[in-house]
Amino acid sequence: MPLYSQIRQSEDAFSEPTYAATNELINDNENACPHCRQERSESWFLKGGRSIVYVSLTFFVVSIGLNFILAILLYSKFHASSFQTEWSAAVADTDCVRRLVAYTPALDSIEYFATNLRDAYRSNDQYLGPPTKEREQMWQDLWLHEAIMVETWAMPLLNRINLDPYEKVEGELGDGYNALLQVHHQLGCLDILRQYTWLLSGKYTTDGIPVPIFLQKPPEENRRHVDQCIEELRMGLMCHGDMTPLLITKKRDGASGFKADMNTHYMCRNFTKLQEWTMSHGVEHWELGDGRGPHEHGRR
């Protein structure tokens, strides 16, 4: 068939061809030239294929970029000190403490340091042994301090809305309520347990070291007080749940069958700094046995 199947002879020979006529002409041309249809099909495929390739490459590059950013964010989260100066890392530690502890006015005094436990707190047995005047005083120096103040605005941070049961700070020292730090209460409880064991052993006498003020009660009341201290220490230990590994040595102990390395590596709080803060922020001195001291359990 000829390339053009007909030559217009009518008066509209030079008028614009209709869509049908144009389509017929294209079909006639492709019928006359079969490879034209194939070229048109291949051209469309190549153009469409390039688009798919471009989209795939773009998606791949974006995915790699997002994964890279995510990796940096995760690394910076778990290795923050790698991206911080020493000063900014210290600030981050303070922020961490604020998130992990209940409110305390002594927050800014909390400072951590890495140490082996016994290397930092070994006392050369100064706190051990039967009661002496010096030993009793050393124990009291650990825990018997003035009350500190929790300001009124901060009481809801301790989940306390009804403030009627709590003792207000007297005078012009501030608008707040008397409190003591839990560590001092726990050390006081430990001291009472120590004293109770020596009391049962007959080591406190009227002509030597007198019976501690908190244990000058009938035996059943003393026992009840000691039980309360045991319960306080149990709850405190369970609440804080120290998960520091206690390594087992190759040595064997006759009683338990194993011997642990008690000089455990710890992140400890600077106890000296806590003591200094407490002594500099005292608002009321409690005399032993005045009915309001740190170990009058259940009294307000």
Curated annotation (Swiss-Prot):
The keyword Transferase appears for this protein: yes
Disruption phenotype: Leads to the accumulation of isocyclochlorotine.
Gene Ontology biological-process annotations: mycotoxin biosynthetic process
GO cellular component: membrane
Annotated GO MF terms: transferase activity
Transmembrane parts of this sequence: 52-72
Family, per entry: Belongs to the ustYa family.
Function: Transacylase; part of the gene cluster that mediates the biosynthesis of the mycotoxin cyclochlorotine, a hepatotoxic and carcinogenic cyclic chlorinated pentapeptide. Within the pathway, cctO catalyzes the intramolecular O,N-transacylation from isocyclochlorotine to cyclochlorotine. The NRPS cctN initially catalyzes the condensation of L-serine (Ser), Pro, L-2-aminobutyrate (2Abu), Ser, and beta-Phe in this order to produce isocyclotine.
Domain remark from Swiss-Prot or TrEMBL: The 2 HXXHC motifs are conserved in ustYa family proteins and might form active sites. Within cctO however, the second His from the 2 motifs is not conserved.
Name of the protein in its database record: Transacylase cctO
Species name: Talaromyces islandicus
Gene this protein is translated from: cctO
